Amino acid sequence: MNEYGGRMIDRMKPLGLAALLALLAVGGVRVIYPTASQDIALQPLVLDVDNPALRRVGGLVFEGAWELRSRNEDFGGISALVALADGRFIGVGDAGTLIGFGLTQDERTDRPFIAPLPDSHGPNQNYKDRDSEGIAHDPMSGQFWISFEANHAIRRYSSGFARTTGILRLKQMQEWPDNKGAECIIRLRDGRFIIIAETLDGDTHPALLFSGDPVERGSAVSAFRYRPPAGYRVTDGAQLPDGRLVILNRRISFPKGFAAKIALVDTATVKSGNIAAGKVIASLAPPYLVDNMEGIAITQKTGATYIWLISDNNFSIFQRTILMQFQFPPDPKTKKPEALAAPGFDVL
């Protein structure tokens, strides 16, 4: 098998690979490379190998995809993603690892790094202290918040992850099942926070809405529920520039393997006692490129909005860390009309 097993995976039949991934999704075969390399390599991918020119996926436009690779033993398992103002991304791994990178125009990584999450690898700490699943960021203060699904906690970190500045272990969160806790954390631009649990009660996820920083005692908390598309579970979420939420939902099934759906949620429906449900705008399933999609982030450039997805490879040789970029076109109904020429200037 060649480097990283990439070509071996490309040669496998899509259906057979999907079935294998479904079986190995929970406990993959971890690949250990004995190196602390900070390098992250990119390999461009297409959305559909049988139709490389395909770009339209539901309401989104495919812009590009890349497989991320590194020989660092801690690289992988990315379960959430956030975009920074300087153009880079930070992903958080479910083994307590921070993975940062940007993309250059020649499809190389910009200032990559792989580092342990502070205060998660001490002698008195175990996997539950490292099972980080969600990440949120305040671009003004530089602070980060990370959710942990096993010990049902939210930790706040100072700018640059220099130190831990607070921790929340809310009673309502402690009632969530082990390893099915805070899967998704979203910071809204008005300062409120949303936390959605991985566990499903019937067809909805329990969720919490905080009036402010969840770590601060003055923040009021209210409960609501999120209904994912049938057969799917929430993995991550972010807020669009227009204020709506974009929620990433994933399905693992045999023999079909992985699938993902992106849903839009009206933020006004996120309120105490309510069930918030989204409208699916795009679906990914074989033969389209898809893996264990767990992270989502939003960027803007020259007025265009982009949705980024990233997959959790479960440290398995049978899966990949895939980064995908889609443009989210503006709704024609809300697009501002073009200005008309003034009288006498329409011929210019």
Describe each model-derived feature in a short phrase.
Residues 2-339, 346-348:
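Sequence/structural signature of beta-propeller domains
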